[in-house]
Every structure is written in C-alpha cells, then in structure tokens.
C-alpha cells in the first residue's frame, strides 16, 4: 500500500514535472521498441484448419520488473501498429513508474499483419478478419508472453489499453478473457453506437456542436454548403472543380457527392482530433484545429474571399495540395463507414468490418447538423455490403456477441470520453457499477487521455489520467494479493 501511495506521488510529480516538456508531436521522445512476429492460427475456431499467418507486435521491456511488474497491453486497432505506438504516450509516461512490460500487437489485416499479403482483401480471403479472431490472437499472444517471460498470471497482471475501436477491443478483452486481462482502459470507445444502438444522426450532430462553439462558424459552413448545392443544381461542376482546385474535375452527381463527402470528412477529422497542440494523428493539424478552421473561415470571408474559395482553404488545413490540386479520391474513400474508413489497404479492412461487426450507420440531414443531406441507413448498408464483400449484414450479431447495453456483469473497466469527441455520446457516460467507471474529460477530443502529457493539456485531462491511474493501481493491488500461478 505504502509503495503505491509513493507511486501515486511519484507519478503525479513526474507527470507535472520534467516529462511535461516532451515534444510528442515530433515523436522525439517516443520510446524505442523491438519489432517481433508470432505465428497465429488464421482461424482459431475451425480446428481442421491449421494454417497460420505472421502477426507483428512491438515490445519494450526496458522498465520491466519481472517480480511483480504488470504487463501493459495496447489492443491494436485499425491501422499500422507503429502509428498507435507513436500516439499513445500515456502508457509510456506511466510504464516506468509501474515497471511495466509494454506490448502492442498489430490487428490482423492491418499494417504488416496481412495473412495473404496484398490479396488479403479478396472476397474469399477477407473472412478471417473479425473481432473474435483478433481477440483470440491477442489472448494467445499474451499467454505466450507470460510463458516466455516466466510471469505469474496474477502477480504480473495484464492491463489492456485502447483508444476508439482499440478501446472497444480493450473492453471486449475484459468481457471475454477476464482470465487473461485484469482490467481495461477503454478510451473513447463508442461501444453502444458500434453495436447499432444509437440514433443515426448522433455523430454528425456532435461534429456540428464542436464547430458551433466558435462564433459565426456554423452559419458560414451552411452558407458554403448551400453555395455548393446551388452550383450542383445548375450543373456547374466546372465552377466547383475550379474553386476546389480538383486534380480531376468532377462532371456528374456522383463526382459531386464525392466532393461533399470529402468536405464533410474534413470537419469529421478536425472534430475528432481537436487536440490542444499540433499533432499528426489523422493528419498534420495545428493546435485546436476546430478553432483554427473556424477563425480562418471567418477571416477569409471578412477579407472578401468568396465563400467557395474560403471553404477550399478550410479543407486545405487537413488535405495536402502539394501538387497544387486536391485528389479527392485519394484523400477520401467512400465506404460502409460514413465517418471514414481511412486510406490505403487499412480502409479495405475497415470497410469489411463496418459491413460485418461494427455498425457506423450515421447520416446527415442538414437540420440537426450543418451538413447537406447525405442519407445512409441499414438498407443502403446492406446493399453496399452485399455488392462489395458478398456479405449479408447480421445487424443483431454485435449486440448478441458483445452484450449491447447489458454490460453490468463485466468488471474492472474504465470508459473514458472527451466531450469534444463526436463519438462520446456513443459510449457509457455514467458509472455502471463500482468497477465499471466512466471518466469524463470536458475539454478532451478523441482519446486525448491516451496521448502523452503536454504543457498545453487542459486540467480536465490531467484529472482524468489521475482517475485512470487510481483504477489501474486498484486492479494491480487486487492481483498482488493473490498467489503466483505460472502457466
Ligand atoms: C513513428 O515515429 C517514428 C519516429 O519516432 C517515425 O520514424 C515513424 O515514421 C512513425 N511511424 C508512424 C507509422 O507514424
Ligand atoms: C502531404 O504530402 C507530403 C509530401 O507529399 C507527405 O509526405 C505527407 O504525408 C502528406 N500528408 C498528408 C496528411 O497526407
Ligand atoms: C484570424 O484573424 C484574427 C484577427 O486578425 C487573427 O488573430 C487570427 O490569427 C486569424 N486566424 C486565422 C486562422 O487566420
Ligand atoms: C465514477 O466514479 C468515480 C469514483 O469511483 C468518480 O471519480 C467519477 O467521477 C464517476 N464518474 C461519473 C461520470 O460520475
């Protein structure tokens, strides 16, 4: 106990002190890692199929105390695992104090962990991508690590961390494998929304709310979308292509829809990563990008720049126009997830997941949000998914498999949410029980709490991290009371 009081003191002083001056945005102080690979069954659930694939994982054991140090496990989500390593500084701020082993496994079908290389995304190969298979990968790898490092199952407890879909996975790991994971920090994990249990207008309404905090912004955004609609109605695709400096001019309604989606996505991303300092997570963005974008829009129009050009300037805060034009098809991919599938191969895998287990049926109506009407519903999702992946959507399955809103029999999970994050209303915002704790970060965007501490951090995220550390300590203390059990 005394050790832990000391630990808390140490931790808070180290968080408030020297480490605050780390410059996370340039990755200058991102700790080193070893890149390792492990063989995993392609299909954990069909015992007649013994094919395997190579899963990548990153490890740091420089602070690890094998006697009773915990294992900090990041539940890799939809992307290159190195990018999550670079953007999850909170774990590295606290790992040395906890003397933890840090492990980041990569999610199958993302980054380098492609079971069939570039043909992994063929209809007959993609079927091994699922939440269940991924969790089984993690459970198997964590068990192997416990054996390799000769750990006690109890005295070296495994704590799961994750942000966004990674947060969902962290929570699910605790539901499904409590024998392996002692507790989970699920940051910005919209578990209800992705189970299809939220209204379809929720997400973009909350994107709008973020921009509505900036004076004069939303009316200008509406005016700009109206100007786009007017041009499109008159068939003036030439004007739009010129004003938006498109590399490949649009010439029809389909092209125009893509332009709208690309534009809407700029708002989505800026709202999600509305961090208090410049960051390179889903793009290279300035501090408080929502405020920056709004001020620039207000400034531009005040200077007499026409509304469409001002709007294009706003988009260029997020999107590159290095070749002096925008390739909207390169920069935004339309898919089953209107909140964005990301880019490249990762977007293909996420598209498939959005068709199978993660329901992100969200749409805009121009009333509860500031965007043009872009409808999306279960029927459209079904048509798209059948056509693209040959899968029939099973809408109820996520709630059956992962409990829907009936989560109170789970224990030891922190659900943290930032109120600037457009996903926050999709997850638990109140305490469910003594050990299912909700942490609210008033000035936090998408999993700000998982990022490394920064001099510009608002007070609310410092308090949130403190509450999270308290819970983690509780889980570890609980574990240490129990005898050592080896595998
Ligand atoms: C992570 O950061 C390192 C620098 O520490 C950088 O070289 C690398 O490109 C980054 N990786 C990703 C995927 O962002
Ligand atoms: C912008 O373009 C540069 C140079 O082509 C590239 O290195 C960078 O990754 C691009 N950034 C984004 C956010 O696409
Ligand atoms: C907008 O104009 C204000 C007042 O001139 C200035 O302080 C601010 O930096 C400008 N912001 C942007 C993003 O252009
Ligand atoms: C949940 O309970 C913890 C104490 O266990 C408290 O600090 C926190 O504020 C509560 N969360 C909410 C959203 O009320």
Description of each model-found segment:
Residues 322, 329-398:
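Small-residue-rich helix-loop
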Residues 163, 169-351:
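Alpha/beta-hydrolase
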Residues 125-149:
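Alpha/beta-hydrolase active-site loop
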Residues 2-101, 112, 121, 420, ...:
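Catalytic-loop region of hydrolases
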Residues 151-165:
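Alpha/beta-hydrolase fold nucleophile elbow
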Residues 109-124, 449:
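Glycine-rich "HGGG/HGxG" loop immediately N-terminal to the catalytic nucleophile
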Residues 409, 415-417:
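Short beta-strand/loop motif that positions the catalytic acidic residue
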Residues 417-418, 422-427:
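Conserved alpha/beta-hydrolase "acid-adjacent" motif
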């Amino acid at each position: 106990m005394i050790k832990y009081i000391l630990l808390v003191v140490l931790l808070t002083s180290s968080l408030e002190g020297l480490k605050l001056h780390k410059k996370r945005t340039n990755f200058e102080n991102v700790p080193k890692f070893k890149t390792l690979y492990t063989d995993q069954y392609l299909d954990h659930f069909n015992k007649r199929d013994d094919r395997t694939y190579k899963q990548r994982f990153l490890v740091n054991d420089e602070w690890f105390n094998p006697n009773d140090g915990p294992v900090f496990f990041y539940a890799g989500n939809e992307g290159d695992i190195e990018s999550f390593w670079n953007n999850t500084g909170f774990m590295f701020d606290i790992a040395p104090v906890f003397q933890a082993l840090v492990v980041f496994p990569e999610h199958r079908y993302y980054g380098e962990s492609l079971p069939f290389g570039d043909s992994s995304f063929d209809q007959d190969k993609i079927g091994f991508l699922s939440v269940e298979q991924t969790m089984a990968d993690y459970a198997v790898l964590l068990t192997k690590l416990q054996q390799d490092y000769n750990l006690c199952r109890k005295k070296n407890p495994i704590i799961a961390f994750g942000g966004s879909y990674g947060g969902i996975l962290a929570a699910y790991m605790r539901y499904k494998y409590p024998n392996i994971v002692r507790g989970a920090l699920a940051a910005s994990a919209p578990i209800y929304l992705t189970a299809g249990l939220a209204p379809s207008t929720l997400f973009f309404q909350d994107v709008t709310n973020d921009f509505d905090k900036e004076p004069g912004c939303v009316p200008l955004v509406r005016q700009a979308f109206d100007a786009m609609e007017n041009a499109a109605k008159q068939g003036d695709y030439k004007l739009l292509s010129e004003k938006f400096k498109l590399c490949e001019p649009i010439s029809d309604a389909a092209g125009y829809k893509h332009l709208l989606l690309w534009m809407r996505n700029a708002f989505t991303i800026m709202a999600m990563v509305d961090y208090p300092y410049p960051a390179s997570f889903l793009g290279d963005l300035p501090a408080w990008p929502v405020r920056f974008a709004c001020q620039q829009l207000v400034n531009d129009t005040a200077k007499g720049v026409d509304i469409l050009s001002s709007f294009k300037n706003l988009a260029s805060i997020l999107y590159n126009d290095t070749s002096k034009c925008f390739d909207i098809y390169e920069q935004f991919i339309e898919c089953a997830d209107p909140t964005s599938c990301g880019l490249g191969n990762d977007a293909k895998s996420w598209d498939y997941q959005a068709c199978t287990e993660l329901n992100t049926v969200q749409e805009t109506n121009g009333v509860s949000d500031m965007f043009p009407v872009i409808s999306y519903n279960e029927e459209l999702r079904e048509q798209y998914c059948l056509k693209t992946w040959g899968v029939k959507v099973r809408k109820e399955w996520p709630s059956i498999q992962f409990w829907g809103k009936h989560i109170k029999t789970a224990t030891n999970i922190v659900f943290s949410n930032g109120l600037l994050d457009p996903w926050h209303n999709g997850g638990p915002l109140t305490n469910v029980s003594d050990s299912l704790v909700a942490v609210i970060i008033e000035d936090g965007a998408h999993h700000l709490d998982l990022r490394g501490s920064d001099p510009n951090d608002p007070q609310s995220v410092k308090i949130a991290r403190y509450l999270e550390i308290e819970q983690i300590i509780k889980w570890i203390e609980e574990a240490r009371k129990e005898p050592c059990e080896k595998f």
